[in-house]
Every structure is written in C-alpha cells, then in structure tokens.
C-alpha cells in the first residue's frame, strides 16, 4: 500500500441499475497529495466523492482508505467511520448553530474540542465570527467555516466539491491563497472536484480528467 490514503479499484455506480454514472474508475491518492478531478457537468465528479464518503453505494468495485476496505460487494463502512471530510458547494452549515458550534459539531465528544475549535478559528481568520450565525456572515466566511468544520475531526482525506463556484473571482483568489497555506501547514491530503482548470492548477499538484481514468 505504501503511503496511499485512498485506493479505488474498478469502481462503478448506477442510480437505477441500468444507466452507468461511473464506470470502472481506478485511482490512488497518496498522503499529502493534492488531486483535482475534472470533467464536464454530469460526468459523475460529485458522485465519486459521495461514494468515497459513504453517502452512495457503488454498483461494483472497491474503495480502500488507509489500507482498510470501506466498500466492496460484501460490506459498506458507515460514513462517520471512514475518516474523510467533505465540503460541498452549498456549504451545508447548520443555520441554528453559531460558527463556533458548527465547527465543533463533529467533535462534540473530543476532550480537546475547545482547543481544536480555537485553533481552527484562528487558522481561518474567523475568530471574530465565533458567535455569529450563518445568515449573519458573508459567503466567503461561510465557506471558511464549512472547511474548518470538515477539518475539525482531522480527516486523512479532505474532499472539496466545487467549494468556490458561487464566489466572485477576487474572493476565490483570496481563499485559494489561504487554503493552500493551511493545507501545506497541516500536510492535508486533498481531493478537489471542479470544472475550472485554473482553479485545479492553483489548488492541486495533480489534475485528472474523470473521463480518462
């Protein structure tokens, strides 16, 4: 296995048992690698992330995370036991929770919760927003919060599904710089789904077209 974090072997998916949305995908992502998955709308990019996260069941094939098979023909490991994080385009923050409580939602039983939240608030430069609710902060601040929340449990693999597509160019570039610095500091393994080749080149070392794997 070497230092691989994720291995996909002959992974296929079908929503209705007839129309194939993903067909025999094989891919390896190594520790601290930053990979972008490119492809046109409807090519299955988001579905691929949902399969890895355990939110969809594959038609066939194997998903291995940190040397452990989490999905094959015989069993399916629950999403919360896969040690992966997923950030989606719509941010999916809990509207009734503050920024601080959103970030801490997935680590409520962690004894180091207070320190982890404090460190992430500082890292993403949102300490001053800790008591604010999602509707009280900007789109960029919401996205910072969403990424911080996904990193709170220290996932081995952080997956980003078109996370900046709703933001303007200036804000995107600001977040690119911040996120690259954070990823480097934490040696975080990243899988980014995007249709934007320029974004992929800025945020990843390896750009892969889904139609070619």
For each feature predicted by the language model, list its residue ranges.
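Helix-to-loop junction immediately C-terminal to a conserved catalytic motif
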Residues: 53
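Conserved ABC transporter NBD signature motif
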Residues: 61-72
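ABC ATPase NBD coupling module
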Residues: 70-85, 109
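Conserved ABC ATPase "signature" region
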Residues: 71, 111-130, 180-181
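Conserved H-loop
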Residues: 187-193
